[in-house]
């Protein structure tokens, strides 16, 4: 990876500043460090992503604590509830309120977490459409370019359009936020693919499955439990997706 992925050097003063515009609302902060190399040591100022602990409270009960970026919190709550199988969809969520470091959620009825359904879908995607989404994943990852400290997730529509894009310090929360954002916009996830930068573990595959995606793709590696779950559910799972190749571990019939 080229040196400029994280920061651009400026001779005077000795600081790192990213190529991205300085957005005062972005979840990062400047901090000092010492660079040690064959040329010796020097003081630098770099940007780092902000991580905060957010508590998820559902119907008066704390169910989870997430370490994530303190942004897009409604999307996080909606996506988390759907991806964890706690609600069927946004219509089952009565309200989401942010109170300090907590997200207070109310829902209609209850649903068990292991609500997996075998995928029955005729959705198909061309590799070039997927590679185009991966290119956009890199282009839109502005906080990653400033800090090197985030994962990204993108909801890719059947025709190649982008339903949502989110970054987070947590790969799970990036997926939750992308799902929540797409659902709040009324997107039918059964006609979409989840594109992400994180490893495809069973946790991530389970989230994607509960949300209703037939296809999940990552530019990173899969894990065996994630592959096994995708096969059991009839999902398409592809990883190491980097132009001009991707490796399909389950459901290759959906990739044209």
Residue ranges, per PLM feature:
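Surface-exposed beta-strand edges and their flanking turn/coil or helix-capping segments
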Residues: 69-71, 77-82, 118, 168, ...
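Short, basic/aromatic-enriched C-terminal tail that caps enzymatic domains
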Residues: 246-256
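Intrinsically disordered, low-complexity regions enriched in acidic/Ser/Thr/Pro/Gln residues
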Residues: 2-158, 162-165
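Feature captures the catalytic cores and cofactor-binding loops of soluble hydro-lyases/lyases
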Residues: 171-248
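A general structural motif
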Residues: 137, 141-149, 167-179, 197-199
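Solvent-exposed, non-transmembrane amphipathic alpha-helical segments
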Residues: 83, 97, 150-157, 180, ...
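Short acidic/polar capping segments at secondary-structure boundaries
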Residues: 110, 161, 170, 200-201, ...
